[in-house]
Amino acid sequence: MSTGLRFTLEVDGLPPDAFAVVSFHLNQSLSSLFSLDLSLVSQQFLSLEFQQILDKMAYLTIWQGDDVQRRVKGMVTWFELGENDKNQMLYSMKVCPPLWRTGLRQNFRIFQNEDIESILGTILQENGVTEWSPLFSEPHPSREFCVQYGETDYDFLCRMAAEEGIFFYEEHAQKSTDQSLVLCDTVRYLPESFEIPWNPNTRTEVSTLCISQFRYSAQIRPSSVVTKDYTFKRPGWAGRFDQEGQYQDYQRTQYEVYDYPGRFKGAHGQNFARWQMDGWRNNAEVARGTSRSPEIWPGRRIVLTGHPQANLNREWQVVASDLHGEQPQAVPGRRGSGTTLDNHFAVIPADRTWRPQPLLKPLVDGPQSAVVTGPAGEEIFCDEHGRVRVKFNWDRYNPSNQESSCWIRVAQAWAGTGFGNLAIPRVGQEVIVDFLNGDLDQPIIMGRTYHQENRTPGSLPGTKTQMTIRSKTYKGSGFNELKFDDATGKEQVYIHAQKTMNTEVLNNRTTDVINNHAEKIGNNQAITVTNNQIQNIGVNQIQTVGVNQVETVGSNQIIKVGSNQVEKVGIIRALTVGVAYQTTVGGIMNTSVALLQSSQVGLHKSLMVGMGYSVNVGNNVTFSVGKTMKENTGQTAVYSAGEHLELCCGKARLVLTKDGSIFLNGTHIHLEGESDVNGDAPVINWNCGATQPVPDAPVPKDLPPGMPDMRQF
């Protein structure tokens, strides 16, 4: 049975006694990878291939006699072949925890709507770290958008853990090879403390728990933290949280750390400020001690007893340890002072919560390009704030759909309360994405650009003089467009409305066309003028109506023609006047009717001619008077007929024919001359049957049966 201190090392795939440990150095601290450096000797294996050792699990055991005092497990990350004297081979080896693998992978990726446990779990699982435990008591809300950008998985994990106030350490089972990574946000979950007495005797055995040296120190550290941030959803929110440090009796309290942006969007920022404060002051008070016990390592709590300075006899939290073992006799023929073990450790008062100091977040060097995404078949995909989602060129994980990124705000040319400019980037368009404060978690779209598949309007360079704003019909091929062409001598402003165009002017509108103005309307036009309309035409106006024209004037209409007016109606013209109608001609008026003219007067018609009045009828004239007809001639009245002139009244007739005959026929004929009745003829026949019948008036062959009423037309 062995009674002394000894160290052994086993490597998977090799015999348990393949190596003898000459010395080792185990360095551990909270939120860091432990590093175990070993010097080894082997008499069995004078030559080893790297594939037999590297990436294999190795197990260091510290013994006191046959009792295990400590076990450490890790993977071999470095192996060196040393001297070979043909009897034995010296080797050097470095062992690290499985978490060490995370430092070998660098990545660009996006985590969406995941909390810190889910994010870190993904990183650990992908790196083969299966034995780990999250011990969280603080709230850790999900993050809408969290980006790992060019960081190793290890750097990203450490940064995220520090930001969330989480520290980690390796929990070693003392009597077995069980070992796991513990992520913790409170000291309450640390193992129960155990007592270690003060004993300055450095010759105690390893199995004897004691501390031989213990030095307590304090230093000036930041005294307070102020964090501030902004969210567009609550622009008036102060977004500020203050956290004062504790236990600052020995220093001034003016050492403020101001952090912006604080990377929070709500009341959770108070926790961020507190976690930062704990991190900045994690080494404000530190005690450093020495012991031969291997049981003191980060993640454990101890209670110091028996120290001559009474205030040091209290509970402490171990934050770092440096365990060094020497076993020189493992090399045959080499003498030494025997097997030794020293543990230099650091502790802080157990009533303080140790947290890692905040780590710098990578900043983006400049804008990036991305492609707007959305659901399959959708052309425009946005939320109530006009935000869109994009697919970054470096993103290998998220598909190009409605989940490819967080909602990203879009910078517009102008943005006011209910006014400004708005143009939503469409699915498939390439956009330029910048980042607020260089923070990958806060993207913002600052512009758009064309590429080989999304070409510009027009055909460059031929249309290089054109400035164009052209939209595209939603799920269609049409477009609306405003185009300015600055080609010399061909300057043009072009407006195209795919369907409806509405223009609203609340006060005045002036249109000034220096040369020509042409309007073409495919269907109907309606113009409504509430008050007055004035048209001034300098020279000529031509108005052509293809079918019908209706003009309605509510009250009066005045038409003034300075010189001539010609009105031509192809078939029929009807004029209806409600009360009175007057035509005044200053000089000459001529009416020409090619076929028929009809005039109807409901009551009376008067005709006044200042001097002469002439009526010329080519064939026939018919007058029909319902009652009385009266003609009055101031001087002379002449009635002339070329063949037959007849005057009739009932049975009385007076007929004059062209041969000079005069026929007077009536029932009773009375001749009365107040002075004389004279008659002269060679022969006068009275009552002798000499009278001849009165001839009838000839009937014209071209007389129509009756004049039509033109109103029917």
Task: Describe every region a protein language model picked out.
Residues 309-370, 446-452, 456-467, 700-702:
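Acidic, low-complexity/disordered segments
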Residues 37-48, 281-292, 414-420:
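Short alpha-helix capping/helix-loop boundary micro-motifs
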Residues 180-181, 190-193, 635-637, 643-713:
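Intrinsic-disorder/coil detector with helix-boundary
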Residues 85, 114-131, 138, 146-350:
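Extended, domain-scale alpha-helical bundle/helix-rich regions
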Residues 1-19, 209-211, 365-371:
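Polar/acidic, low-complexity leader/linker segments enriched in S/T/G and N/D
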Residues 48-133, 137, 142-146, 158, ...:
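Surface-exposed cap/loop segments at beta↔alpha junctions
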Residues 175, 183-186, 365-665, 669-672:
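Structural signature for extended repeat/solenoid scaffolds and their inter-repeat hinge/linker regions
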Residues 96-98, 113-135, 257-271, 375-403, ...:
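Glycine-rich, acidic and aromatic/proline-enriched surface loops and short helix-turn segments
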